[in-house]
Structure formats: C-alpha cells, structure tokens
C-alpha cells in the first residue's frame, strides 16, 4: 500500500459543497489509497460504476469485526465491537434480520401511511403559523425539519404521543453538529434505555407497531434476544433521522439559492418528487455510507485490492460523476435522468430500507410547505447559513426563516 496517502475523511470545500478532492480523484485516480484516523490505509472509490460494484460484490464484506474493515473514528472502532444489526451483516444473516422489519417500509405500506405523513406536516406547519414570526425569525430546523421525521419514525416504532417531544429533544442533542461527544453519548444512552423499557412493555402488552411485531414474531419464539429488538429499533430511529432533518433544511436553502426553480415548485407542487430526486443526488447527506473489507483479492476499477484490505466507496462522489450526470455540480430539478440510479440511498442489497418512506416525507414537505407559506424566506444572507462543521456530513444546524 502507498505511503503519503491523503488523510480521510476529507473536509467539505465550503458550507454545502462536497470535498474538492473527489472531483480531482475521479479525473486522475478514481480508486486510490487514503489514510484513516489511526494511521491505517484503505481504498477510496469515487466513480459511480465502481461504487456500484463495491455495493454489490460478494467478494467484499460488511462485517465490521473483520480484519481491515475501515473505521473512520475511534468511536466507530468502539461501536464495531457491539452486537451487529442487519446493516453490518453479510448474507444470509443480513436479509434474515432485515426482513423482520422490511414490511413496514414497502411502497404499499408507505402509501397507507401517506395520510398520517400529510397530517404530521400540516399540524407542524399550523403550529408554526400560530407562533408566527412577529417577534423575529423562526428556526425551521427546530420547529419543523426535526419533528417531521422524528414524529413519524417514533410513531411507527410505537412510542406514545406524549413522549414524542422529549425523545425528539434527545435525538436533536445526539445529531446536532454543535453537541459535545459526551452530550451525544448521554443522549444515545437515554434513547437506548427508553427503547429497552418500551420493549419490555410491548412483550407484555403488544400493539400495532414495529417494536410489538419484533417482540411477538421474533423475541417470544426465541429468534432474537430482547437486546436485539432494542438495537434494531434504535437503528431504525437514528439511521435516517439526522439525514432527513438535514435534507429538509438543505432543500429550503437550495430553493432560496435557485429562485426560478422555487417559482416552478410553488406554481406546480406536483413537481415535488422530481425536486426530491435531485435534492438527494445533489446533497448526499450521508457521505460515507458504503464501507467494506475484501474477503479475497479483487479488482476494483484498475486496482488490485488484496484480501483484508478496507474499501470506502463514496456515494457522495458518485452522485457528482461527470460520466453519469450532465453538469453534476448544477442543481437542476428538471434534469434528464440517465439510466443509472443516483446513489443518495445507497445501492444493492444494503440500499436504505426506508428509502420509500424518506422520499414520501420529503415529497410531502416540499409539496406543502410553500403552499402553506408562499412568502417563506430564509432570514439570513445565504452566505451566512449555519452549515454543519466542514468535517461532518453536510447539513444545517439552524435555519431562521420568516413567512
């Protein structure tokens, strides 16, 4: 392996812009080596076709305890020792556990949820309207972007309505770019403790929700332990939540930067699905999703990767691949899509389980927000938006708006 490899993760170029290194590597060295926090080396894959190969190759493993698996931080290395959930499993265990919760997230199930999603969005916008902005701008993240996905996933899990606000606060602490590691860790534990109590309750008194299903269909027959049910619930709760909060805020900021496309969406809210599709390509809010280790020697692009070497495939870089997307650095909700998929939700068997739910939520948000508040504006200069730190996933910490 090469010495003198650049340190990874890269920092973003500026607020919403992906790291400049990705474009350079796609052009000159699309499969190259990078140095991780502990001095170890891994292969970084930056082009769309190679990222898709990494996501689907059976010669690569998702199991974090395997030799060479690339962890990006000390806390990641620690987390890898915990009992895994399906996102960190290979076949056949992966599909076996994933199928326990998959029925909740099918297109059909999400369609049945649509009235609840719409009601949640409407209620939160109505609350914002009642508060008004006569006393100054309102933080769209706190009042809207955070509670929308939080309330929906909590309700699916079976959290009583009275606890939604408290749990949403805990979730905000663990995902907010400005919280300390200790605060985030304490909030994590609060959520795990809460879910453990809920699992105990649902074992005795099941209802119609994900945790009850796990208890009735999996824990009671002895297929999984109670601790597994808690970890699966926690995964579903946290995996996409910060990403969704960020995508809502990034969507509003992006429309403010593209007034012509905002005018289009206001005039025709049925364009929301294509806006969401482009949003998820342009701002790949979880930049480092696809990590593997080689089970055997394998060619990736033009490089030979040896057994037990780590691989990081950047779906964020793949979504800006010039060979796949025309003018990839332009935000264009009217773009003509190539046959290849954008990779905002990953690719292959490990593709995000809640993709249909996430798109339904985002589509509902952007088809409703500007109908309810046609005069909604970002209340700070666009160059002064408070983006997450440049070494974290792209997002917005708070977004003052007036309407």
UniProtKB/Swiss-Prot annotation:
Chain ranges passing through the membrane: none
Regulation of protein activity: Cyanide, CO, and oxygen strongly inhibit catalytic activity.
Cited InterPro entries: Cyt_P450 (IPR001128), Cyt_P450_B (IPR002397), Cyt_P450_CS (IPR017972), Cyt_P450_sf (IPR036396)
EC numbers for this chain: 1.7.1.14
One Pfam family this sequence matches: p450
Consequence of substituting residue 73 to A: Decreases the NADPH-dependent activity
PANTHER family assigned: P450, PUTATIVE (EUROFUNG)-RELATED
Protein name (Swiss-Prot/TrEMBL): NADP nitrous oxide-forming nitric oxide reductase
Gene source species: Fusarium oxysporum (Fusarium vascular wilt)
């Amino acid at each position: 392996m090469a010495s003198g490899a650049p340190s990874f993760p890269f920092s973003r170029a500026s607020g919403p812009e992906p790291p400049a290194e990705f474009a350079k590597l796609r052009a000159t060295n699309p499969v190259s080596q990078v140095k991780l926090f502990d001095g170890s080396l891994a292969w970084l894959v930056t082009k769309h076709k190679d990222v898709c190969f990494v996501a689907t190759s059976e010669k690569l493993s998702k199991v974090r305890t395997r030799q060479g698996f690339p962890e990006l931080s000390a806390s990641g290395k620690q987390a890898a020792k915990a009992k895994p959930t399906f996102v960190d499993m290979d076949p056949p265990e992966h599909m076996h556990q994933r199928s326990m919760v998959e029925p909740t997230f099918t297109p059909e199930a999400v369609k049945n949820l649509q009235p609840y999603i719409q009601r949640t969005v409407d209620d939160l916008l109505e609350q914002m309207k009642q508060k008004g902005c006569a006393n100054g701008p309102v933080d769209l993240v706190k009042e809207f972007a955070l509670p929308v996905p939080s309330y929906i996933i909590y309700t699916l899990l079976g959290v009583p309505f009275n606890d939604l606000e408290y749990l949403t606060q805990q979730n905000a602490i663990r995902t907010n770019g400005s919280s300390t590691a200790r605060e985030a860790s304490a909030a994590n534990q609060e959520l795990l403790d809460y879910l453990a109590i809920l699992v105990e309750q649902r074992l005795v008194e099941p209802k119609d929700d994900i945790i009850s299903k796990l208890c009735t269909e999996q824990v009671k027959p002895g297929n999984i332990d109670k601790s597994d049910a808690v970890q699966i619930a926690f995964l579903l709760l946290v995996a996409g939540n910060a990403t969704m909060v960020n995508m809502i805020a990034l969507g509003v900021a992006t429309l403010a930067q593209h007034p012509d496309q905002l005018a289009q969406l206001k005039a025709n809210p049925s364009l929301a699905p294509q806006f969401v599709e482009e949003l998820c390509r342009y701002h790949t809010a979880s930049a480092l999703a696809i990590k593997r280790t080689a089970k055997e020697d394998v060619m990736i692009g033009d490089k030979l990767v040896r057994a037990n070497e780590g691989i990081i495939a950047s779906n964020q870089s793949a979504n800006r691949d010039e060979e796949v997307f025309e003018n990839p650095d332009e935000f264009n909700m009217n773009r003509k899509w190539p046959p290849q998929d954008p990779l905002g939700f990953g690719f292959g068997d490990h593709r995000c389980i809640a993709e249909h739910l996430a798109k339904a939520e985002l589509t509902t948000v952007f088809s409703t927000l500007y109908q309810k508040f046609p005069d909604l504006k970002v209340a700070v200069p666009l160059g002064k938006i408070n983006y997450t730190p440049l070494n974290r996933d792209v997002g917005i910490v708070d977004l003052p708006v007036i309407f």
